[in-house]
UniProtKB/Swiss-Prot annotation:
A divalent metal cation 4 binds at C39, C40, C50, C54. Keywords: Metal-binding, Metal-thiolate cluster. Disulfide bonds: none annotated. A divalent metal cation 2 binds at C9, C14, C16, C27. Class I metallothioneins contain 2 metal-binding domains: four divalent ions are chelated within cluster A of the alpha domain and are coordinated via cysteinyl thiolate bridges to 11 cysteine ligands. Cluster B, the corresponding region within the beta domain, can ligate three divalent ions to 9 cysteines. A divalent metal cation 7 binds at C56, C64, C66, C67. This is Metallothionein. The keyword rRNA-binding does not apply. A divalent metal cation 1 binds at C7, C9, C22, C25. It comes from Scyliorhinus torazame. InterPro entries: Metalthion_dom_sf (IPR017854), Metalthion_dom_sf_vert (IPR023587), Metalthion_vert (IPR000006). A divalent metal cation 3 binds at C16, C20, C25, C35. GO terms for molecular function: metal ion binding.
Length: 68
């Protein structure tokens, strides 16, 4: 059983739990199936939330951009 839980879309907004990947968080109402800004919370483990997405701790070159 995986620790990763799926993202749930409610009222056009994405709700992410634990370390679900942003690629799994696709709301039907969002353009081209992309994650909405409310999905910034679905960062991979070791990442911190930023205004324009998620940036990994440690390696500056390793970005986890959830909201690009």
């Amino acid at each position: 059983m995986s620790d990763t839980k799926p993202c749930v879309c409610l009222d056009g907004s994405c709700s992410c739990e634990n370390t679900c990947r942003c690629s799994d968080c696709r709301c039907p109402t969002s353009k081209a199936g992309r994650c909405q800004k409310s999905c910034c919370s679905c960062c991979p483990a070791g990442c911190t939330n930023c205004a324009n997405g998620c940036v990994c701790k440690g390696k500056a070159s390793d970005k986890c951009s959830c909201c690009s």
